Amino acid sequence: MNEILSITLSFFTFLIFLCAPLNIYKSETFRFRSVHQNGIANLIINLNFLIIISLLPFKLISYLPFYFTALVLISIFNFLKKGEIFKFEKLIFSFFFVLFLIISLDVAVKLNLGWDAKWFWYIKSLFFFQNFNFGYLSQYEFNSFHPHFGSYLWAFFRELSLNKFEYSGRLFYVFLYLSSLLFLIDKFKENKIQNFIIIFLLLLITYNYKIFSGLQEILIFSLLIITTKLIYEYLNYKKNFYLFLIILCMNLILWIKAEGIAYFMIILVGLNFIKNFNFEKRSLLLFSSFILILFKTFIYNYFQISLNDQPYFVEYILKLDLQTIIFKLKNIIIYGTFYSLKNIIFLIVPIIFFINYKILFKDQFNKIIFIIFMLNIGFIVSAYMFREMEIIYSLRTTMDRIIFTSSGLYVFYLINFLKKKNYFRRYIL
């Protein structure tokens, strides 16, 4: 019973981050097509603000109550000024809560952490939870392998929880995951059965306790889902606010894992293939991206933290011979195919490209997703080809997670394809 109460309070705590600082309904500029999507903008803004806060030389406990209280007060102000933002549809709100409760109970019962979580992410979260600041991470031997932000969120929401148990911080990962899936649905009340099927289908395909065992892939996966949906919205409605949110999502990805820079660049290149993308917006996108990367580089240099201690060395790359390249490529294809068969989203995407071959480069969204997919494949191959590590061990221990993370780029593309072809109505409903 205590766990259920704590999980319920955590859910409502997380909701505050959807309800402030913006009252999205106040301006047409900030309006999505359904109420439950509006909060995602606030969530993205809040998470970016937390990145800045996490870098400050203050103890977590010294500012967390003030920050959360400010969000609560702003939420109340928004409610009094324009209550619509709080009028979550009862059906989707109940659905959201039930799913969150079920998955959170699974997390609370199983508890075991993934290998990387034990050695990297949890230890980093303890630094913040025990009121050390970002600067102290330089004292942690394995800190430079990956950025800190996912661990910071773990500590931040653990401190906000009722029981302050370790798993309480990870419940935010569940919340972000479910928020990203529900973000795909424009109008939940319309075609309720279809929308229920979509969510359950995605849960069936993607849910596994392992992704909530402290590993950070679920954060990037969720943010990639949101990003591709925002790209689609921008292509259709040309609202600058969508482009702004895309840039903020890219920034979040940059601070979560070392490979975040690869997804950052993949999205950046894909966006530059938008037709009629005027010089002003293109320049703003490139300049913003440059500033974000430069800012992270500056922060790491200032705190004397290595940007990336992953096993990639120019000397090793230059010494690669043809036999080694063929051996690595063969195994990359074998393991890539095997894990793609286990991840149906990644497997289906090329099939959709084949079905849509007539409009692949005529339709803007299809073209950009195709370019992103090709860049994604190039990244996966390069990541293993140029890595100075035993290839079989590396593939067996990490390929499944890279495939899972990357599949976040194609979740909305898959759902959008099924809707447009009326496959749900034709074969399921």
At which residue positions do the language-model features occur?
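Membrane-embedded, hydrophobic transmembrane alpha-helices
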Residues: 1-86
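Hydrophobic, aromatic-rich transmembrane alpha-helices
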Residues: 18-24, 177-189, 268, 272-275, ...
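Membrane-embedded helix bundles of polyisoprenyl
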Residues: 43-50, 96-100, 171-188, 193-234, ...
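Membrane-interface alpha helices of multi-pass inner-membrane proteins
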Residues: 53-55, 209, 242-258, 264-269, ...
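Perimembrane helix-loop-helix junctions
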Residues: 79-88, 236-237, 263-288, 359-360
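Membrane-lumen/periplasm interface segments of specific transmembrane helices
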Residues: 109-110, 273, 280-357, 376-380
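Extracytoplasmic catalytic/substrate-binding loops of multi-pass membrane glycan-assembly enzymes
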Residues: 110-124, 130-153, 164
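Membrane-embedded glycan-lipid processing machinery
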Residues: 146, 154-157, 165-175, 207-219, ...
